[in-house]
Amino acid sequence: MPEYRSKTSTHGRNMAGARALWRATGMKDGDFHKPIIAIANSFTQFVPGHVHLKDLGQLVAREIERVGGVAKEFDTIAVDDGIAMGHDGMLYSLPSREIIADSVEYMVNAHCADALVCISNCDKITPGMLMAALRLNIPTVFVSGGPMEAGKTKLADHNLDLIDAMVIAADDSASDEKVAEFERSACPTCGSCSGMFTANSMNCLTEALGLSLPGNGTVVATHADREQLFLRAGRVAVELCHRWYGGEDPTALPRGIATFEAFENAMTLDIAMGGSTNTILHLLAAAQEGEVPFGMRDIDRLSKRVPQLCKVAPNTPKYHIEDVHRAGGIMSILGELARGGLLHTNAATVHTRTLADAIAQWDVTQVDDDKVHTFYKAGPAGIPTQIAFSQATRWDTLDTDRSEGCIRDVAHAFSQEGGLAVLYGNIARDGCVVKTAGVDESIHVFEGNTRVYESQDSAVKGILADEVKAGDVVVIRYEGPKGGPGMQEMLYPTSYLKSKGLGKHCALLTDGRFSGGTSGLSIGHASPEAAAGGAIGLVRNGDKILIDIPKRSIDLLVSDEELAARRTEQDAKGWKPVEVRPRKVTTALKAYALLATSADKGAVRDKAMLDG
């Protein structure tokens, strides 16, 4: 049987010094024979999705100790993409994912921890911790801080989220008073922003990967039920330790759970629920860390056969994550996919032997269990707060309408093609990604003249100055992992196009990425990126681009001979922006850019460069 990793620092005469230090942290004689379980928390006062996590690590720790483990908590960094957006702060967002992954690896390996509980929530924190878990491959369970409640105002006939505040602020016809009311109402509580944005998408995907508990992605942060998820996560971590160190059960380890089939399940869920395009980037990165051969071609294949069964803000103002929970949460979406023959239900989870077992226990349309039904009735209280578990409001009824409700069955899907698609063509040889759930059907095939910008900043200025007209394809380049560096989110350009009434009349193509709050014909992750010699760097103003989502194609309508001539010219000039950008690129960002791969590889480090 495998020995506890912690024995390296807790056993033997030569570890007397280490034990002395362990004792100084509070360990007693009897603790040196127990598993040491690291708790990677991510509390910060900078991020609403993490502001309530301060005491939750200790909540998990006490439960771990109650059931026979030793708990040791530490914190990672956490960047708020919404606060970092629109200025050079966004250059740090994606690179922070690698820092988070490294910090978890450093702490766990330096102290020889036996298992790991990841307390994550927002955009780069869950992916960073997921990458670390698959690197380390020790028993791991994820538990998130939970989603924010949707906002409410008398000035709108629907619930609000962050994007509503941004769009109204960019609308010149809106009064200052209306903008202020939306600003004060859009984000009422702690938690990750309330739509199907990147944070919530990733927390939902951990359920499909099998690494978190049912409800992880959907119970609002303020609800008392989420406390039980934290307590149970502590117990599960100890159980996983016993299964691995006591029984050498490979399905107690992340790589035994998050297999190729599990990654297909996660991507299938993402497509079905119209998740953020960023999830593709993060799943590809996690797969590389776990040595799972899951790539863009697999995503392309799945996108052609998986229907969209759930539509949530920003793709519709009607539903937010709290409504997904009321409809049965992720387990109910997985149940509909399973009945459609679209899942690998034999995949393992941290809480059941198979995903089929999990669905059988938790799908509200299949289970006659008052406890399960009560759990999924957990709802918002509508009281602004930054305190976790501070309310116990429940819906009177569940939404089990699978023909017209928030979650649909396959026969009544919002669309028979899913919410994400991968496009290929001469402008993106290795692919690019579009969130089809947010694209009006009238522009699924679109041809337009290019309006080229060398940065997000110049694109924003151009859009606000009315340089962009209906029928244009806005191209924003040199914003990829290397070129940015850091692959900025393009939420402001898409929001401003929307506020200008161009959301259904323009396209946007970039080697950068998009916020989970983006909608419209917004195509990102163009690979290779411009800074790596990608054809997006060869586009000129006035060229034509043809986008055909049904055919999964995107092409620059320029002859091969002309493209070859442009490439020769660009090789001589160097692959860098034409204009000088007033952008401070620090040593830390330069180090990230040096090793970063393009988006089709998840923007992870180029290991070939490290291996020489």
Curated annotation (Swiss-Prot):
Modified positions (N6-carboxylysine) are: 124
Question: Which residues does [2Fe-2S] cluster bind?
Answer: 122, 193
Tell me where on the tree of life, at the top rank, the source sits.
Answer: Bacteria
One GO BP annotation of this record = L-valine biosynthetic process
Instruction: Identify one Pfam family in the record.
Output: ILVD_EDD_N
**What keywords is this UniProt entry annotated with?**
2Fe-2S, Amino-acid biosynthesis, Branched-chain amino acid biosynthesis, Iron, Iron-sulfur, Lyase, Magnesium, Metal-binding
One GO cellular-component annotation of the UniProt record comes to: cytosol
Q: Where is the active site?
A: 515 (proton acceptor)
Q: In which pathway does it act?
A: Amino-acid biosynthesis; L-isoleucine biosynthesis; L-isoleucine from 2-oxobutanoate: step 3/4; Amino-acid biosynthesis; L-valine biosynthesis; L-valine from pyruvate: step 3/4
Question: What cofactor does its activity depend on?
Answer: [2Fe-2S] cluster; Mg(2+)
* Enzyme Commission code(s) on record: 4.2.1.9
Cofactor: how and how many bound: Binds 1 [2Fe-2S] cluster per subunit. This cluster acts as a Lewis acid cofactor.
The Swiss-Prot or TrEMBL record annotates one GO molecular function as: hydro-lyase activity
| Recorded catalytic activity of this chain's protein | (2R)-2,3-dihydroxy-3-methylbutanoate = 3-methyl-2-oxobutanoate + H2O; (2R,3R)-2,3-dihydroxy-3-methylpentanoate = (S)-3-methyl-2-oxopentanoate + H2O
UniProt: Mg(2+) binding residues: 81, 123-124, 489
Instruction: Write down the InterPro entries for this protein, in alphabetical order.
Output: Dihydro-acid_dehy_C, DihydroxyA_deHydtase, DiOHA_6PGluconate_deHydtase_CS, ILV_EDD_C, ILV_EDD_N, IlvD/EDD_N
The entry's function note states: Functions in the biosynthesis of branched-chain amino acids. Catalyzes the dehydration of (2R,3R)-2,3-dihydroxy-3-methylpentanoate (2,3-dihydroxy-3-methylvalerate) into 2-oxo-3-methylpentanoate (2-oxo-3-methylvalerate) and of (2R)-2,3-dihydroxy-3-methylbutanoate (2,3-dihydroxyisovalerate) into 2-oxo-3-methylbutanoate (2-oxoisovalerate), the penultimate precursor to L-isoleucine and L-valine, respectively.
Oligomer status and interactors: Homodimer.
Stated family: Belongs to the IlvD/Edd family.
What PANTHER family does this protein map onto? Answer: D-XYLONATE DEHYDRATASE (PTHR43661), D-XYLONATE DEHYDRATASE YAGF-RELATED (PTHR43661:SF3)
> What is the protein name for this chain?
Dihydroxy-acid dehydratase
Question: What is the protein's species of origin?
Answer: Xanthomonas campestris pv. campestris (strain ATCC 33913 / DSM 3586 / NCPPB 528 / LMG 568 / P 25)
Q: What is the lineage of its organism?
A: Bacteria, Pseudomonadati, Pseudomonadota, Gammaproteobacteria, Lysobacterales
